[in-house]
């Protein structure tokens, strides 16, 4: 079995698949949509990430029962910290996603949230200076330049500094239609809920799948208005948000998203099923 982890991203090895060097070739994890290659037999997904559009995919879709991706957790002891709001007396939203995922629709939505929540702030983590300047200009035009804060990119060997940034955040905001994945796992491990928006394809449903499997599906918005309303609601209902954070602290490690043992079993079964399927077609 050959597994593609890059798809059409830069520095990919997609040409290897053209030669059909393995009887079973699948796409998983790194590139969540079809690459268009007929030599890719399967895309590994789940029931939440690929729905009615499945018929438009070239490869077969294999749906793992719970979630297409699981995380082993992070090598840092989990602690429960009170909401930053209680110390700051202002509400802090955060999004540490790659700036490539931050489009005009996302910015407009975040701006509306900040305008509806008095004395609130938004922390973004920047690695692209040009994007940072564009975003600053947009917020300045909206009279919100003092409501945005940028954290600089941390070094790869200094993950703890990055991880501790979540201690400054009351509620995380996901990007759309290209959702975060690693950042959502990080936030939930740190007991910080994430507002996401359900989308129309695999990449735009990653947040939906993670939050459903984390048992906080009520943080999944159906549209932009719902996204805004949910963010504003929790900013104005601190006790409700704190209840969710406490629940995450107590339960998140037991959920499907961090159940690597259960996921490994499902993953191995998936690979075996794919081999059987390909062998059947060769007979």
Task: Show which residues each predicted segment covers.
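A donor-sugar binding/catalytic signature common to diverse glycosyltransferases
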Residues: 1-12, 16-37, 158-206
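Generic beta-strand/beta-sheet core signal
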Residues: 4-5, 45-46, 96, 125, ...
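Generic, well-ordered alpha-helical scaffold segments in large soluble proteins
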Residues: 5, 109-116, 138, 142, ...
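Active-site-proximal region of nucleotide-activated glycan assembly enzymes
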Residues: 19-79, 83
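Conserved catalytic-core segment of nucleotide-activated headgroup transferases in glycan assembly
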Residues: 66-157, 161, 165-167
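C-terminal amphipathic helix plus adjacent low-complexity
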Residues: 96-99, 112, 124-127, 134-137, ...
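Catalytic binding pocket for nucleotide-activated donors in carbohydrate/polymer assembly enzymes
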Residues: 175-260
